[in-house]
Amino acid sequence: MSGCNCGSSCNCGDQCKCNKRSGLSYVEAGETTETVVLGVGPTKIHFEGAEMSVAAEDGGCKCGSSCTCDPCNCK
């Protein structure tokens, strides 16, 4: 995946947008706006304060063991 690299604090780079919790992407939400698209497929949404986590799609950048990105394979 181009542009996918490991950043600081054991997470993938800015374009990967993943933290140590594999399979989750984090998007900072400055406002409480929600858009729902129906009929596309199942989506898991969890609101926690101003942070929203959405399950990543298959093939997305996930953080693996030893602070490496998988499938980015950054070391």
From Swiss-Prot:
GO terms for molecular function: metal ion binding. It comes from the Eukaryota. The keyword Metal-binding applies. It holds the Pfam family Metallothio_2. The keyword Kinase does not apply. Keywords: Metal-binding, Metal-thiolate cluster. Belongs to the metallothionein superfamily. Type 15 family. Metallothioneins have a high content of cysteine residues that bind various heavy metals. This is Metallothionein-like protein 1.
